[in-house]
Design a protein with these regions (language model features):
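Core catalytic alpha/beta fold that binds nucleotide/phospho-ligands
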Residues: 1-253
């Protein structure tokens, strides 16, 4: 048995969930009265995203906890990060970009995940205030020979920063420029200049490419000093289909 931490990622492409009355009715049955009020307040596109996200989270967590999805009670920490009460500790985090929802789950420790679509029209230098000089230099390193790498590198750095603040639950209150990432061929180095250096070492990061035009990054708080985690990734359409997928790790020569 592996001594690495185990992380499961569930990818749900919203556009592949059938838009028919039977599916909608079935999914709505999993919402609490408070969640139904929230659902009713959204515009149709946002309401659909909220509904599918909730059903995805509840079905996956119910399986982990050995309970019914109707029994999954999602609560919020004071910092706004969601958690679930159960017979054992299960940590999770949710993200979405365009019509892709990603849920990351583990029993190891706090986890954060962020996904972004790689927009090759994005003027990333307009947000260079959130980047350390060393990050800017790395992003532009191959600009003359491979211009597309600039965007992949920028969105990798961005998702790494977001995954960390989602893992810690501190949100955008933390100055992103002070979260410095150095992406090496074998691992990702991280320095949080606003925090204790020893605490920084508790976090482990990985980045992946999904369907060629999305990048997602995972931040895992390693409570047992394990250097890596095993990732099992699935495409899941709740109550419709599930199959294993293999996202491509972000690598650079």
């Amino acid at each position: 048995m592996s001594d690495r931490a185990q992380v499961q990622v569930y990818v749900c492409p919203v556009s592949r969930v059938p838009q028919d009355h039977l599916v909608l009715s079935h999914y709505l049955g999993f919402l609490s009265s408070a969640e139904k009020l929230r659902y009713d307040q959204y515009h149709p596109k946002a309401a659909r995203l909220f509904l599918i996200s909730r059903v995805l989270v509840k079905t996956v967590l119910a399986d982990k906890l050995g309970i019914s999805p109707h029994e999954v009670n999602l609560l919020l920490h004071p910092n706004g990060k969601p958690f679930v009460q159960g017979s054992k500790a299960v940590y999770f985090n949710l993200t979405h970009s365009a019509d892709i929802i990603i849920l990351a789950v583990t029993e190891e420790g706090e986890i954060g995940v962020d996904i972004e679509k790689v927009d090759r029209e994005f003027e990333w230098m307009r947000v260079d205030s959130v980047l350390d000089l060393s990050e800017i230099e790395w992003i532009k390193e191959k600009e003359l020979t491979d211009s597309s790498s600039v965007f992949q590198r920028f969105f990798q750095i961005w998702t790494l920063k977001e995954s960390y603040i989602k893992c810690t639950g501190e949100g955008m209150s933390r100055h992103l420029k002070k979260l410095n990432f150095h992406v090496l061929p074998e691992h990702i180095q991280f320095l949080d200049s606003t925090n204790d250096a020893q605490k920084t070492e508790e976090y482990y990061f990985e980045s992946y490419i999904y369907e060629s035009n999305f990048i997602f990054s995972i931040c895992l708080q390693q409570r047992h000093n394990l250097e890596r985690f095993n990732l099992n990734c699935f495409q899941l359409l709740p109550f419709i289909s599930t199959h294993r997928i293999t996202p491509t790790p972000c690598t650079y020569n």
